[in-house]
Amino acid sequence: MSTPKSDTCSPHQALARGMGFKNHHERLWWATFGPLLEKLLALCNYPVSLQYQHLSFIYHHLLPYLGPYPTVENGFAWKTAYSPDGTPAEVSLNFDGPKKTVRMDHVPISQWSGTPKDPFCQNVALELTKSLAGTLPDFTWDWFNHFVQTMFIPEPATDVVLAREPPNFRRMAMQSVNGCDLLTAGVRVKPVFNALWKSIETGIPHDKLLFDSIRNNTELFGAYLPALQVIEDYCQSDRAKEFQTRGCFLSFDATSIKDARLKVYLHGPQTAYMKVEDAFTLGGRLSNPNIQTGVKELRKLWYAVLNLPSDFPESEDLPATDDLYQGWLVNYELRPNNPVPEPKVYIPVAINNKDQDSIVQGLQEFFDRHESMDVRDYRDIFETLFLDAKNPTGIHHFITFSYKAHPYVTCYYKPHLEPVPAKELEESDVKGLSK
């Protein structure tokens, strides 16, 4: 009697076979992000049961909110500035000492985004958040509802705001971004807000709207205001104004824990290292031992992953790119009753998107200096994720750095997408196409 042949499949394939897809858009998004997330989770030694748990979460709660898949004829239905080519999602790998964590971030999008049914992409963000809140036991609405009230556009103002819309503005003005940390204990959700549309409505500068939305609610944010004041003082300084450094986003942990983080993001279009370092230290306002060590390590990492010669002037900007969000970002973690913001720099390695080898080499040199991070072969990690038959299938978008007694580095990845003919997205028996 012959033994039946086993038909084994990977976790992301098993989920697809068991549940199918609502439409071809979801099928194609899963073909891109399903195997990528599975590889990341396996590389980070997540138990198989936890891999299924997190893949199932992405499948049910994020996949339906990635929007229409790009077509050959029309590209993206809602093209954001979230990545250089408009892809609305990315994955990331965080190295916190020897601990490694997988993450996924995306702009919530639907077929109605940009239409009269959802002109600012707000309704889909609310729908997504309701879905997440119904699943995550520690989700809290307090901060989210506050920022919806202060940042979202009320329906009566829609026509006025659209009439004032500048060219290319929709790509820049992402009303909401959703971040998810895939942790051992579950999923941590981090909504992101900006005030660009609200600035169009009110005529108030968007960075002022961001700071005011926090400062004006002492009931929710009183414990965070001393740290916020340090950031505001820097933004009002002559140096920050000279470098055109301004507030651009805010984010937070949507959890009920008492030490939930509030994050404020600054953006600078001028990419000379000295300007980034100035923001990292908030013009010298931050000078504790972590900052002093962090500055030294930041410079090494910046020069390594951007493949800059050691004598490249710190006062010279990097080459311009066609990325609408070109420049750098720094976010500052604010914790309750802690007057010291904790900075994290986003290094814009996407300017070297044709030179992934230098980025990989620069990261490995950094990891080799910090053996406690336990990254012996970063090239193998990157090639496992993004090398198919010797052809790269993704790029590094950002590398982030902070220092908290040890280096804290995150690699953000954008997979390549292949647009399909529109006819391939026509409705049919989609569930039968779930392999």
Curated annotation (Swiss-Prot):
Positions annotated to bind L-tryptophan: A81, Y82, E90
One Pfam family here: Trp_DMAT
Induction summary: The onset of expression occurs at 60-hour-old stationary cultures and the steady-state levels correlates with the onset of aflatrem biosynthesis at 108 hours. Expression is regulated by nsdC.
GO BP, sorted A to Z: alkaloid metabolic process
Alphabetical UniProt keywords: Transferase
Job description of the protein: Indole diterpene prenyltransferase; part of the ATM2 gene cluster that mediates the biosynthesis of aflatrem, a tremorgenic mycotoxin with acute neurotoxic effects. Synthesis of geranylgeranyl diphosphate (GGPP) by AtmG (a GGPP synthase) precedes condensation of GGPP with indole 3-glycerol phosphate, followed by epoxidation and cyclization by AtmM (a FAD-dependent monooxygenase) and AtmC (a prenyltransferase) to produce paspaline. AtmB is also essential for paspaline production, but its exact role has not been identified yet.
Protein name per Swiss-Prot or TrEMBL: Indole diterpene prenyltransferase atmD
The organism of origin for this protein: Aspergillus flavus
Gene: atmD
